Amino acid sequence: MTKSYSEESMMLESQSSSNWTDKCHSSSQDERDVDKTSEPMLNDMEDDDDAGLNRLEDEDDEEEEEEEEDGDDTKPKRRGPKKKKMTKARMQRFKMRRMKANARERNRMHGLNDALESLRKVVPCYSKTQKLSKIETLRLAKNYIWALSEILRSGKSPDLMSFVQALCKGLSQPTTNLVAGCLQLNPRTFLPEQSQEMPPHMQTASASFSALPYSYQTPGLPSPPYGTMDSSHIFHVKPHAYGSALEPFFDTTLTDCTSPSFDGPLSPPLSVNGNFSFKHEPSSEFEKNYAFTMHYQAAGLAGAQGHAASLYAGSTQRCDIPMENIMSYDGHSHHERVMNAQLNAIFHDS
């Protein structure tokens, strides 16, 4: 009986031990399965945490950018490369670069001024007291080249007046006077716009008395008046006739004074290094004052003016009347009054 009991107990213990080992094996397998399933879950959680952190960082960056944009509304956003720090070497390079640029500009201006000075010596305009400006020099050179090209194209010697008008086209009045003085002409003789502006009764007087000195003075310029002309350099000028004013005082008709004759219009001057040559020069007799030869009989004056007859008993007398006292722009009536006053003073002077 005891043997059987012990055997049964041994069998029960063996069965219980086998069941325990099976349970241990099964529990270990379950733990392994749990570990295998929990690992991806943990990885997923870690990934979610990283994504959340990244998302938070992105949101922070966006907020910072928005704040910067709000701040940029008040100040303009600077573009381009960042400003480098100024060092001594960079400052020295900048200084040398600036000095080289200044030297290049200085040389360029010196060359331009030298070229303009050479051009001033070639164009037909020279003055010791007045120097042409840059724009006037270029305009005069352009007109001079165009006029010479027209002469070469036509092959004929042009009229002096047309040549001077083409030469002075578009120039200012002081430059025109300088050109006229260099060519020994009066600006009033070849400027049609001046004669158009004058009244009709003054145009004839201007044409008759163009031998008067003419000067043009511009305010603001330091140089003396330009283009002062002498009567000895005016061509084709016919003085006013004073014979009709003297006829009432004498028995015979007086002859009018005539100007010396010239060969014709001069050819345009040729400029070679600033020297101008003409075909011929005006006569020296033209430099003298106009002389009025008065022929009268001594017997004709004896009845009315006894003392005047004894004073002017010669056959012919020569009377020189100053031109500055006669020549004016008032018309014929003023000249007649001047002549009457002078003759009365001569005849009644004792």
Swiss-Prot record:
Pfam families on file: HLH, Neuro_bHLH
Location(s) in or outside the cell: Cytoplasm; Nucleus
Protein name per its UniProtKB record: Neurogenic differentiation factor 1
Bias (Low complexity): 7-18
Function comment: May act as a transcriptional activator. Differentiation factor required for neurogenesis. Acts as an upstream activator of isl1.
Organism: Danio rerio
CC per GO annotation: cytoplasm; nucleus
CDD domains reported for this sequence: bHLH_TS_NeuroD6_ATOH2
Glycosyltransferase is among the record's keywords: no
Spans annotated as Disordered: 1-91
Keywords of this entry: Activator, Cytoplasm, Developmental protein, Differentiation, DNA-binding, Neurogenesis, Nucleus, Transcription, Transcription regulation
Domain bHLH: 96-148
PANTHER family named in the record: BASIC HELIX-LOOP-HELIX PROTEIN NEUROGENIN-RELATED (PTHR19290), NEUROGENIC DIFFERENTIATION FACTOR 1 (PTHR19290:SF88)
Bias (Acidic residues) ranges: 44-72
PROSITE patterns xref list: BHLH
Example of a GO MF term: DNA-binding transcription factor activity, RNA polymerase II-specific
Gene: neurod1
